[in-house]
């Protein structure tokens, strides 16, 4: 333990040294101005009069980062919180989740499943093979788009262990804006776990690139990502007694020396994802005051423009002096007073005699009696001019025309170079890329979905208390599976659905959202999805008590891979009924006491799941034979009850966070869940001066 910590400290020192070196060299590079000299040679001009950066060292660069998520169907923006590097940061690399709510195989990036049923992702698409690796994938609805006043770079590396069982989690993110409307960025994610047991290594790579344009009339979001996921499969250790009762064995085994069921077996997933949403708004303009951040950014831009103009004037004077053969005095030019002067076209008033007759009193002029009154009027005019300078023209959208394109392309390959004798119960084909005891099962799937929507937006007038949308979607799906002759069987499915949304998100007291979608043609004809939520925020004891209700009714088609799958040892073609899933959930939240209570009831009819069975031929569990997997469907409904309490306590620098979850499943052989799940985190939090 001590040696591991010592190695990690050495690695941290190396990283810190590199960081300090980079920080120390940056000012040196900034002070070295490489430019074209008079001899047209590219060389440093350190010995010359080097001009300062146009930004100026005495001006503060605006800092600020806004992030938001979008609705996957309509692209509606929802403000989000920027990730911090303090609270719970040490848990971010863990496959088990921030609060240990996931079951996994223990290794970084290994397959996992959420123990809390109501927190599992409902719609993960058709490709079920990528679902257990959601630690590296990010749904569109959870991705953070960025808008930043200055470029932002964030690089993190979390590492532990050694060359045998070490784990590395690397992330690099860069975000920048081209103007206030266009934002873009990219991100690298790499997870590598060597594994504590034999044949347990994982390697996941993801590259993400995004862009957004937020204009008054036109708005767009683009998200592109590609993933490569690789996991070594060992089938578990051959005998649990290696861990439970190590004294039964004559030899002592290290973790990576314990025999496993499988060797040289790999599971690989590759995928490419493209999401594009854009809309055109029709509305009207109105004047509103800028935010403090916008005012700060505008002042910075004005100061930069003024300084750039001064630099341009100095450069012109320098060139003029060079052409005239004169010496240019930098100090004298900087001290030269600037006079506005009289305009060239100004008229000179003559000494004409005043009219003798009395002028008629104008009704359009304002009488100013005394200097104080004049000063007051001038101050008011100056204040009005300043107020006008910090006003902006806001475009209020009334109607939106929305289009969303979502494309996903997957490939999954299971490779085995050797398989234990009689390990599998069935063998459906021997032709293909590998023969003998080797396996090469490959399947491909791509899906393209287009959605068109027409929206009347909330809040464009005092009478528009809610937003209303109508949409139509077309979904095209393609699948490829091997056949018994070594070829490929191809399947195509299409679906057309229509629906609508009614929502209210503005205001403080009441919010609600209801969405309904009906399948009208194709494979998903007859499906129905109704989702809704409502929250009421009541002032209570000097704070806000939030009462939240949510629920849904889904009648959906089971995933293609529950209905059809072809592999060398697993094969099924099922005619499954539609899954009917109903949920009602209530949440009570009180920020003053840091308390939240959730209670949910689920009922699922025709639940689809995978069932595995095998034989154990001796007592030591080492000889497993007849392994088979089948997709099944539960005919009778499965009922689940979930009650969850969040309670945080803070007393001075002492913080204590607790989550207690109770779950009950009516059919544990179909949906097994732990009856009790407890999470507790006790820590000290204080400022460091």
Residue ranges and their predicted role:
Residues 31-275, 279-348, 353-356, 360-363, ...:
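Membrane-proximal, glycine/serine-rich, low-complexity loop/turn segments characteristic
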Residues 1-35:
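Bacterial Sec-dependent N-terminal signal peptides
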Residues 325, 352-383, 625-628:
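Membrane-interfacial, low-structure loops and terminal tails that flank and connect transmembrane helices
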Residues 22-24, 162, 194-198, 521-523, ...:
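A generic structural signal for short coil/turn motifs at secondary-structure boundaries
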Residues 16, 23, 148-150, 394-396, ...:
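A generic structural signal for short, non-catalytic loop/turn and secondary-structure boundary residues
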Residues 224, 258-308, 314-316, 380-689:
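Exposed, low-structure sequence patches enriched in small/polar residues
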Residues 119-126, 139-143, 152-155, 176-180, ...:
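A generic short-segment signal for beta-strand/edge and adjacent turn/coil regions
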């Amino acid at each position: 333990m001590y040696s591991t910590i010592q190695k990690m400290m050495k690695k941290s020192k190396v990283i810190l040294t590199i960081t300090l070196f980079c920080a120390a060299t940056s000012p040196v590079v900034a002070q070295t101005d490489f430019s074209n000299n008079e001899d047209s040679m590219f060389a440093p001009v350190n010995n010359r009069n080097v001009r300062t950066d146009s930004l100026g060292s005495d001006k503060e660069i605006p800092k600020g980062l806004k992030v938001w998520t979008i609705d996957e169907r309509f692209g509606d923006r929802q403000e989000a919180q920027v990730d911090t590097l303090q609270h719970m940061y040490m848990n971010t690399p863990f496959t088990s989740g921030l609060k240990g709510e996931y079951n996994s195989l223990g290794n970084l990036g290994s397959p996992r499943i959420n123990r809390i049923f109501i927190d599992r992702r409902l719609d993960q698409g058709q490709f079920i093979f990528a679902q257990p690796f959601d630690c590296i994938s990010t749904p569109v609805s959870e991705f953070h788009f960025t808008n930043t006043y200055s470029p932002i770079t964030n690089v993190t590396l979390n590492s532990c262990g050694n060359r045998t069982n070490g784990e590395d989690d690397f992330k690099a993110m860069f975000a920048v804006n081209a103007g206030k409307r266009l934002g873009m960025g990219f991100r690298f994610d790499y997870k590598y776990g060597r594994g504590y047991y034999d044949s347990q290594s994982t390697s996941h790579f993801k590259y993400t690139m995004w862009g957004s344009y937020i204009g008054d009339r036109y708005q767009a979001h683009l998200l592109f990502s590609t993933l490569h996921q690789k996991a070594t499969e060992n089938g578990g250790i051959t005998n649990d007694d290696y861990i439970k009762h190590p004294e039964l064995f004559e030899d002592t085994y290290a973790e990576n020396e314990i025999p496993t069921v499988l060797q040289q077996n790999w599971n690989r997933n590759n995928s490419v994802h493209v999401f594009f949403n854009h809309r055109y708004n029709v509305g009207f303009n109105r004047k509103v005051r800028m935010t403090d951040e916008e005012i700060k950014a505008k002042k910075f831009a004005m100061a930069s423009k003024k300084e750039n103009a001064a630099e341009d004037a100095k450069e012109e004077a320098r060139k003029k002096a060079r052409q005239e053969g004169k010496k240019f005095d930098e100090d004298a030019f900087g001290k030269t007073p600037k006079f506005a002067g009289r305009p060239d076209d100004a008229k000179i008033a003559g000494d004409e005699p005043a009219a003798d007759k009395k002028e008629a009193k104008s009704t359009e002029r304002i009488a100013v009696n005394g200097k104080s009154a004049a000063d007051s009027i001038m101050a008011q005019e100056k204040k009005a001019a300043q107020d006008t300078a910090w006003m902006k023209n806001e475009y209020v959208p009334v109607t939106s025309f929305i289009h969303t394109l979502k494309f996903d392309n997957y490939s999954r390959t299971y490779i085995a170079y050797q398989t234990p004798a009689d390990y599998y119960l069935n063998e459906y084909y021997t032709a293909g890329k590998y023969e003998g005891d080797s396996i090469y099962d490959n399947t491909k799937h791509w899906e393209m979905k287009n959605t068109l929507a027409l929206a009347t937006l909330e809040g464009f007038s005092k009478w528009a208390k809610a937003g209303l949308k109508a949409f139509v979607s077309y979904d095209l799906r393609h699948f490829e599976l091997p056949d018994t002759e070594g070829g490929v069987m191809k399947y195509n499915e299409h679906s057309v659905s229509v629906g609508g949304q009614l929502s209210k998100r503005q205001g403080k007291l009441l919010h609600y959202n209801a969405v309904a979608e009906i399948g009208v043609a194709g494979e998903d004809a007859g499906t129905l999805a109704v989702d809704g939520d409502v929250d009421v925020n009541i002032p209570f004891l000097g704070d806000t008590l939030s009462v939240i209700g949510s629920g849904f009714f889904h009648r959906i088609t089971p995933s293609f891979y529950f209905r059809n799958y072809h592999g060398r040892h697993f094969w099924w073609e099922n005619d499954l009924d539609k899954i009917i899933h109903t949920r009602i959930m209530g949440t009570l939240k009180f920020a003053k006491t840091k308390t939240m209570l959730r209670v949910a009831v689920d009922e699922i009819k025709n639940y689809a799941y995978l069932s595995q069975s095998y034989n154990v031929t001796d007592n030591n569990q080492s000889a497993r034979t007849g392994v088979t997997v089948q997709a099944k469907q539960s005919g009778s409904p499965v009922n689940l009850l979930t009650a969850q309490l969040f309670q945080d306590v803070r007393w001075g620098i002492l913080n204590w966070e607790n989550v207690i979850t109770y779950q009950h499943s009516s059919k544990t052989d179909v949906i097994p869940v732990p009856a009790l799940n407890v999470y507790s985190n006790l820590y000290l939090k204080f400022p460091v001066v």
